[in-house]
Amino acid sequence: MKEDNKTYVDTSKVSIREINKAIAKDMIVTYHYSHAWTMCRYALGIFYKTDELDILGNDEQLIGVAVYGFPVGRSAVTSIIDGLGNDQCLELTRLFIHDGYGSNIESYALGQTFRWMREHAPNIKMLLSYSDPFQGHLGGIYRATNWLFQDTNKIQLMPNYGISLEGEDGTYIHSRTVFSKWGSHNLEHLKTEIGKDGYKEFWRRKEMSKLRYIQILPTNKGEKKKLMNSLKHPCETPPKDISDILPKSERYETYEPENMVNFW
């Protein structure tokens, strides 16, 4: 449903087609918030039809790009779904569109990339994408384009924990830094070592992994049912607020350092 206070893109002026990867790289490195290129199998340019011709006689302007690459890791796909190989799945690694083309331009353009895949890469049966909640990305664009959501934080076999010395709502030290600073993730060890640093308490919280979104690209209803049944983990309603998925922190008291007696 369209909202009165929003501007929407004229979808008749938007088109998608594959572009040179060098052009896509330049756009991503220049404009994407990461300013970093990534793995790329298909670079799909997002074009907008203009009312005037440019100096080369073109009536379309490149306003964005969607970059899809093969997932990294031997078991990247098989850990998610049975029956598909790594060459049948792509990951949306970058998406950038210039501002000023309507509030729904991202969702419309992303949906058009699904159509492009079905037509030009029919061997691709599943798309993946990840959002980082601690970067403020909960995946609103994926909700708008009907991706399936899996809470990877419930799938972790060996979760990592961050430590706060500033209270429950303070800054949490990353697990890698915790190990580097205190030599272990063992809770009893941390109680001792953090106590030696003069702290009487600390808070520990499970670190969140990136949220996983899945788009199935079946050729028919039967294949869709088969692919859905082959997913190894349940799909859930995607979160709308980080508080919906933020792990609870736990408070611990440290051990007081033993009095050291010097013998002379």
How should each PLM-predicted stretch be described?
Residues 1-40:
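Short amphipathic alpha-helix that is part of the acyltransferase structural core
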Residues 13, 210, 217, 242-243, ...:
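A positional "C-terminalness" feature that preferentially activates on distal terminal regions of long
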Residues 28, 41-68:
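Conserved beta-hairpin
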Residues 149-153, 221-226:
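Substrate-binding/catalytic groove segments of enzymes
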Residues 183-184, 204-206, 216, 223-231:
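Hydrophobic helices that insert into or interface with lipid environments
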Residues 41-43, 208-213:
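Short hydrophobic/aromatic beta-strand or adjacent loop that forms the aromatic wall/cage
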Residues 226-264:
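Short, cationic low-complexity segments
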Residues 18, 69-201, 215:
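Acyl-donor binding region in acyl/amide transferases
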